[in-house]
Amino acid sequence: MSLAGLHRPGGVHCGAVPALALKIVPETDLLLVISHRLHLHEFLPAHGGQFGPDAGLLPGDAGSGQSVGGGFVGVAQLHLIMGAQISQGALALPVGILDPVDGVGIIDQSIDGEVTGETPQHGQIIGSVIHDEGLIISPALLDSPDGLSQHLLMGLAMLPGVFRGDAMHRGGTLGDLHPGVGEQFEWGGSGIGDSHHRGGDDAGFKGVGGGGFQVEGEHVCGVEVGGEFHRGIHGFNPNQRPGHRVPPPDAIRDHLESGTVTDDNAQLRRTWNELAEKVRYHRDLYYNQQPEIPDADFDALFRQLQDLEEQHPELAVPDSPTKEVGAPVTEQSSFDNVEHLERMLSLDNVFDEEELRDWLARTPAKRYLTELKIDGLSIDLVYRNGMLERAATRGDGRVGEDITANARVIGDIPHELTATEEYPIPAVLEVRGEVFIPIEDFADVNAQRIEDGGKPFANPRNAAAGSLRQKNPEDVKKRRLRMITHGIGYSEGFQPASQHDAYLALAAWGLPTSSYTEAVETADAVVDKVLYWADHRHDALHEMDGLVIKVDDIASQRALGSTSRAPRWAIAYKYPPEEVTTKLIDIKVSVGRTGRVTPFAMMEPVFVAGSTVSMATLHNQSEVKRKGVLIGDTVVVRKAGEVIPEVLGPVVELRDGTEREFVFPEHCPECGSTLAPTRAEDADWRCPNTRSCPGQLSQRLTYIAGRGAFDIEALGEKGAQDLIRNGILVDEAGLFDLTEEDLLESDVYTTKAGAVNASGRKLLANLEQRKNTDLWRVLVALSIRHVGPTAARALAGRYRSMQKLVDAPVDELAETDGVGMIIAQSFKDWFEVDWHRAIVDTWAAAGVTMEDAETEQLEQTLEGLTIVVTGGLEGFTRDSVKEAIISRGGKASGSVSKKTDYVVVGENAGSKATKAEELGLTILDEEAFVRLLDTGAV
């Protein structure tokens, strides 16, 4: 057996759930404080009056409300303020604050209706509050039955389920609402019980007098009142976002085609945004809360983001999650912060034999240790004079949560170390380990959890992470947690010569070490261990998601050092994803921006590689035939840590004769036009109704609004569909001519009363602001085939004017560096179409800038040079380093070849650095790169 089958996961992530801290909507009474784990701390009803803990809140006063029910503690706040001003710190907020339980997940579920993802109707949240890239762009005005959005119903509208015109909340009627100065408001009625709100005992909320808040009843949605409101309150799964019922399959494929310069390259920015948001979201959950995906899934997403940034340096931003360790402890944490004595780093990953051997070649050692990578939760223990002083989570690597009380009830963690003659107890010892639930105990833990009225954990890793953060140590004790040590941080009085010696000492002191750790001396032996555990990964006591390889000699470890996030002397080999089977219920098609009609599989939900999936792209009808899948088949599904699952093929032996063949539609499902391939040899069938097909137009509008083009926050997929459905836009030409009067015909951008809402006002403001933008962004927004950001920058940089571009001969355009004849001809062909030219003319008439201002040209120190940048640079972002090269006449390339003149290597440099060494290319550090920029020489 070889490692050929143990390949690196790839793909893209769509539908990321954001992690924003604060969003203010100008000129409305609504402000969202978004977080991932919140406590209901305070509730302050006010209606243009004076309300506070003592009924004395005036505009500008510091309002803190009153603690709720005795058990609600924490820093997150739930305010609903109508027309009053609250001072929160130094910020006076003359707006309403709504802090929804568990943040955006609830917003997501509320806006999109039930899990089936139906279109929002009156009585639900009105407005496109979720951007197609997964970002909150504005809280919408909350429209609800009988105009109650003008009162306190907006607070309730963020709870699970949807409000409808009949005032039903998932089958349960709402109680009476009586907002007003000094009056009570109640949330009761039929209550929120099993039949009304998916579980839990009835709960009634009352606002009393001048702002007090009382909680009656025991549970809301099965979550104890007075405790922590978390994901269990609504069962939202970000991997099944109703808001993104299925990523447009042609967009999925567009993302995967990022290696060539096509019109689809602008999708890369969206792909990066989605991946980054997903990483940030799950990183926070992973380190600070209840994880929703396993370690393997998180690491695969992280690697995708790293690879994408390496391949396309222009995508990254300064605060990219690829430069950080863990996640900061949130203000909403129930635990105190504690600093690690020595920084707690992460691990870099490899996914195939080539990458592993490359690392081994770069990291020669006399002996390596191979250890199973436990799929659990990292823990940091500090012993002082042999006594357990404190335990903490990883946090951001420097500061974690103090979980000492919970650690003391884990049987594997000794309260006092045992000294031996060979290994006396150090004065200070910081131990690193992993907490987990044994596989054989997981089913029993889940069974007990269900019996207690809770929801089952998705996997042992999530169970361990959630258990370790319980507030009551007695609850932790019931979870059968185990711990295995895997290293030492800071120590006084103990300096081992090797990692192996450290493990011998830990075991002697009474700390558990792994029986699976082995020492090997050659690269081939390391590979053999990887192969062995690939076949025996389910034989271990615990779940494992890889094999960790460490340089054994401590002196060598110190010499190798570490990057900002991981040691250079250790690597984690990640195994390929799980493969599971499920039923293929149906095959449907979707229409993308370019008219490509793409089939996708609808499957019975199945858990694979850390999340539940129910849809997968099938690319085109030829692929459906190649895979041999029939509707009704049991199919094999693989998910390599990315969000996009893959249907590998059918389990033919399980067919019972009821399966049927998929018939590709003859007509576009969006507009009814006859479908056909552009050329006879094309595998993709397209809708020819380019201008008016609602499916294509909505995708183009969303693309125009994306960060790679005009970056119009308030225009997302739902908003685009609404503008088309209501006849407000017939093509993209009229986008910048939209007026408030036009938006009155919208469902998304108006209130139930018929006025333009906050999202509508923000859309108009965004459009006005974005009229003054760079020419290259305008070119990208036109969706000209093959003209992505790279070609657009090159053309705009050379001609600086749309008119000059249009007038330029095709041969001259083709001479532009990085363009060529294919792109040049595509550009000229696009302008041959009347309605295409009308888009440019109409935008220009509306005030969209069609030329770049003249700027002083920098000295062309890099003229004729091709430069590749890999890894992070301290003084540059991904975008700025590319701009620095291009503006000085150089070519910023994304791949290393013999034609590359220089390779600039920063932190966390990837395989490009290795390839540069193999090719004998000149490698520069950041200092040398800066000299090259300034002088043209190194």
Curated annotation (Swiss-Prot):
An annotated GO BP: DNA replication
One Pfam assignment: DNA_ligase_ZBD
Keyword ATP-binding: no
Residues that bind Zn(2+): 668, 671, 687, 693
Cofactor(s) demanded: Mg(2+); Mn(2+)
Domain of life, source organism: Bacteria
GO molecular function ontology, one term from the record: DNA ligase (NAD+) activity
SMART domains named among the record's database cross-references: BRCT (SM00292), LIGANc (SM00532)
Entry GO CC: cytosol
Gene3D superfamilies named among the record's database cross-references: 5' to 3' exonuclease, C-terminal subdomain, 6.20.10.30, BRCT domain, DNA ligase/mRNA capping enzyme, Helix hairpin bin, Nucleic acid-binding proteins
Residues annotated as binding NAD(+): 295-299, 346-347, 371, 394, 434, 550, 574
EC code: 6.5.1.2
Region of interest (DNA ligase), ranges: 261-938
Family of this protein: Belongs to the NAD-dependent DNA ligase family. LigA subfamily.
HAMAP family (UniProt xref): DNA_ligase_A
Its job: DNA ligase that catalyzes the formation of phosphodiester linkages between 5'-phosphoryl and 3'-hydroxyl groups in double-stranded DNA using NAD as a coenzyme and as the energy source for the reaction. It is essential for DNA replication and repair of damaged DNA.
Protein name: DNA ligase
Organism, as annotated: Corynebacterium efficiens (strain DSM 44549 / YS-314 / AJ 12310 / JCM 11189 / NBRC 100395)
